[in-house]
């Protein structure tokens, strides 16, 4: 008769029957062993990630990493690029815009519609936020 081996508990069960496996899997020791197995696995995965990150920083190969500069100094532009250049070589130089304008996504940004909102001048009843429905009013019979 084949025996059932539990990898978590490192033991053989006496019988390979569903009821024996179910009883074993419901036991406290088995559940503790499973919990410890996955906790150790998660710690190993976290350590691997830390090691990979440390190795990447050591070799300076982090994708999107900002070049290291001395405190207070601006980063040096790439070779062959001048801050006032207009674009690729052979293209005419263009003067920078005097005021860049609002960031993209804010009202007034070029090429974007304004944010939806309540029309100006439509205030709600006193003590309530704008555009809230008015509370029901009671009418006096005449």
Swiss-Prot record:
Subunit structure: U1 snRNP is composed of the 7 core Sm proteins B/B', D1, D2, D3, E, F and G that assemble in a heptameric protein ring on the Sm site of the small nuclear RNA to form the core snRNP, and at least 3 U1 snRNP-specific proteins U1-70K, U1-A and U1-C. U1-C interacts with U1 snRNA and the 5' splice-site region of the pre-mRNA.
Cited InterPro entries: Matrin/U1-C_Znf_C2H2, Matrin/U1-like-C_Znf_C2H2, U1-CZ_Znf_C2H2, U1_snRNP-C, Znf_C2H2_sf
Protein species of origin: Caenorhabditis briggsae
Transmembrane segments: none
Pfam families per record: zf-U1
UniProt function note: Component of the spliceosomal U1 snRNP, which is essential for recognition of the pre-mRNA 5' splice-site and the subsequent assembly of the spliceosome. U1-C is directly involved in initial 5' splice-site recognition for both constitutive and regulated alternative splicing. The interaction with the 5' splice-site seems to precede base-pairing between the pre-mRNA and the U1 snRNA. Stimulates commitment or early (E) complex formation by stabilizing the base pairing of the 5' end of the U1 snRNA and the 5' splice-site region.
GO molecular function, one term: pre-mRNA 5'-splice site binding
Family designation: Belongs to the U1 small nuclear ribonucleoprotein C family.
Source taxonomy: Eukaryota, Metazoa, Ecdysozoa, Nematoda, Chromadorea
A GO CC term attached to the entry: U2-type prespliceosome
Protein keywords: Metal-binding, Nucleus, Ribonucleoprotein, RNA-binding, Zinc, Zinc-finger
GO terms under biological process: mRNA 5'-splice site recognition; spliceosomal snRNP assembly
Zinc finger residue ranges, Matrin-type: 4-36
SUPFAM superfamilies associated with the record: beta-beta-alpha zinc fingers
Major localization listed first in the record, in broad terms: nucleus
Name this polypeptide is given: U1 small nuclear ribonucleoprotein C
Cellular localization per UniProt: Nucleus
């Amino acid at each position: 008769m084949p025996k059932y081996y539990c990898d978590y508990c490192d033991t053989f069960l006496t019988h390979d029957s569903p009821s024996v496996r179910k009883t074993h899997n419901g036991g406290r020791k088995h559940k503790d062993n499973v919990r410890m197995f996955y906790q150790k696995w998660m710690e190993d995965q976290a350590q691997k990630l830390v090691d990979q990150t440390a190795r990447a920083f050591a070799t300076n190969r982090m994708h999107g990493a900002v070049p290291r500069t001395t405190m207070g100094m601006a980063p040096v532009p790439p070779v062959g690029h001048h801050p006032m250049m207009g674009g690729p070589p052979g293209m005419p130089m263009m003067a920078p815009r005097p005021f860049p304008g609002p960031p993209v996504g804010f009202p007034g940004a070029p090429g974007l519609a304004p944010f939806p909102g309540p029309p100006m001048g439509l205030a709600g009843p006193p003590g309530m936020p704008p555009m809230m429905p008015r509370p029901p009013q009671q009418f006096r019979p005449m």
